[in-house]
A protein has these predicted regions:
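Short, mixed-charge low-complexity intrinsically disordered segments
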Residues: 38-65
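A short beta-strand micro-motif
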Residues: 2-13
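Acidic, low-complexity, intrinsically disordered interaction modules
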Residues: 13-48
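Sequence-level detector for tyrosine residue identity
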Residues: 4-5, 33, 50, 62
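A subset of signal/propeptide-processing and intrinsically disordered low-complexity segments
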Residues: 12, 18, 53-57
Length: 65
């Protein structure tokens, strides 16, 4: 698992900080970051989606147990 620390822009001067625990993330053509986890059978399921144009990934902490 990894910790993803995000800053999401909500309005012109409003942001909020988010921490997501996930195995990985993908960038999609539809304009979102998709954060995902794998189950015991290696099936992927979505944990969260955030719009790429309004999301800053500030840091990633790898290998968190």
């Amino acid at each position: 698992m990894n910790n993803y620390y995000l800053r999401v822009i909500v309005g012109a001067s409003t942001t909020f900080d988010v921490t997501i625990v996930a195995d990985g993330f993908s960038m999609h053509d539809c304009g979102v970051y998709q954060f995902w986890q794998k189950d015991d059978n290696d099936r992927i399921f979505t944990v969260a989606n955030y719009p790429i144009e309004r999301t800053i990934i500030e840091s990633i902490e790898y290998g968190v147990e």
